[in-house]
Amino acid sequence: MSLATLTVLGFSLSADAFAAALGKGAGARRPDLLEAFRVGAYFGAFEAAAPLIGWALGLTFAARIAAFDHWVAFTLLAGVGGHMVIAALRAPKAETAEASKARQKRALSPLRLALAALATSIDATAVGIGLAVTEVNILMACALIGAITTVVAAGGVLLGRGAGPLLGRKAEVLGGLALIGIGLKILIEHLSA
């Protein structure tokens, strides 16, 4: 598989991570460049590991994985997104600065980032299964996919950061709805295939 093909694959797989990171950036309290790359690294690491796992599983387990991967992705994304929406809607209208800071810090908690990254990378496992039957340097492919996703997701956080102050709490609601929408998209694509 050519470097150009792998690059296109990397950008394609990073689209869901970008959307999720956009919501994370909008719901967070002014994330800086370092924090944006920390978030990007979560998404990049999961996106790099998923094809490797899929490749290792190979074609033997393809039918078993395909039978439920979309449900796992949907459940994780809908759960994280739903929690973001509920938390934003339940937050008091006149929130103290401390309460606002704590809520926004939770948006970038390691657990929430890991769940969102896991959910957006499940499709990459199926891609890895497909890569098992092609001539590809799987380590190079995974490294490239991870690097692209890291940069794209970090960009999503920074773009979301700009939208966050303009939208206020609505940004967190929109971010949560975006995650739910990604989950629904994955579910519908797999159920209609």
Curated annotation (Swiss-Prot):
Alphabetical list of InterPro entries matching this protein: Mntp/YtaF, Put_MntP
A Pfam match: Mntp
GO function term, MF aspect, one: manganese ion transmembrane transporter activity
Membrane topology, record value: Multi-pass membrane protein
Major subcellular site: membrane
Keyword presence, Manganese: yes
Keywords attached to this entry: Cell inner membrane, Cell membrane, Ion transport, Manganese, Membrane, Transmembrane, Transmembrane helix, Transport
Transmembrane segments: 3-23, 39-59, 65-85, 113-133, 138-158, 173-193
Keyword tRNA-binding listed: no
Subcellular location field: Cell inner membrane
GO cellular component labels: plasma membrane
Family per record: Belongs to the MntP (TC 9.B.29) family.
HAMAP family found in the cross-reference section: MntP_pump
Function summary: Probably functions as a manganese efflux pump.
Protein name: Putative manganese efflux pump MntP
Species name: Rhodospirillum rubrum (strain ATCC 11170 / ATH 1.1.1 / DSM 467 / LMG 4362 / NCIMB 8255 / S1)
